[in-house]
Amino acid sequence: MEERRSRMGLNSPTSKVAYAGGTVTGAAGTSILDPATGRPVGASDPYFLEVNHELSDKGFFVAAADDLITWARTGSLMWMTFGLACCAVEMMQVSMPRYDVERFGFAPRASPRQSDVMIVAGTLTNKMAPALRKVYDQMPEPRYVISMGSCANGGGYYHYSYSVVRGCDRIVPVDIYVPGCPPTAEALLYGILLLQKKIRRVGTIER
């Protein structure tokens, strides 16, 4: 096995590993290069350019506490799984290696008291509605809700059923709606990124 790895060049401390988004260089993948420019990903981002300028000029930079807290929160969102139907399959898929939502700082938690986001995935029935509200009330502030799929958004296929809530927004306030029946894992991932964008725009200290 070691001989095979040596022939492939994987034992070299400066080996390069190619992947869809660019090239990882170094023993532990110290930098991710953009194949179009050859520079590290995000090097031309105005935010990082300003930070680099401040650090090179003063050795430190001054930022508002709200901006710092918002930055930390968007990179450490813990989500509470609330799978109610087939949408939960796609919700689980977004955590698998193909999408790996944890690389965006979005990790699952089994307790509502440790969660920032609730993903309502599937059909919400009248009997389940009090449990949904109870779990939501146990989440610490600020808390967010992603409504995933047509059934959670508005009842979906069971809209006219006597036993189904016509949208989970009748029970809890919803921040992001992800359409589809069921939505793909890519759609949910896009909704998560939109939630992070909303948090950066609105802030987290007062809500």
Swiss-Prot record:
Belongs to the complex I 20 kDa subunit family. It is found in: Cell inner membrane. It is an enzyme of class 7 (translocase). This is NADH-quinone oxidoreductase subunit B. Keywords: 4Fe-4S, Cell inner membrane, Cell membrane, Iron, Iron-sulfur, Membrane, Metal-binding, NAD, Quinone, Translocase, Transport, Ubiquinone. It catalyses: a quinone + NADH + 5 H(+)(in) = a quinol + NAD(+) + 4 H(+)(out). Pfam families: Oxidored_q6. GO terms for biological process: aerobic respiration; electron transport coupled proton transport. NDH-1 shuttles electrons from NADH, via FMN and iron-sulfur (Fe-S) centers, to quinones in the respiratory chain. The immediate electron acceptor for the enzyme in this species is believed to be ubiquinone. Couples the redox reaction to proton translocation (for every two electrons transferred, four hydrogen ions are translocated across the cytoplasmic membrane), and thus conserves the redox energy in a proton gradient. NDH-1 is composed of 14 different subunits. Subunits NuoB, C, D, E, F, and G constitute the peripheral sector of the complex. The gene is nuoB. [4Fe-4S] cluster binds at residues 86-87, 151, 181.
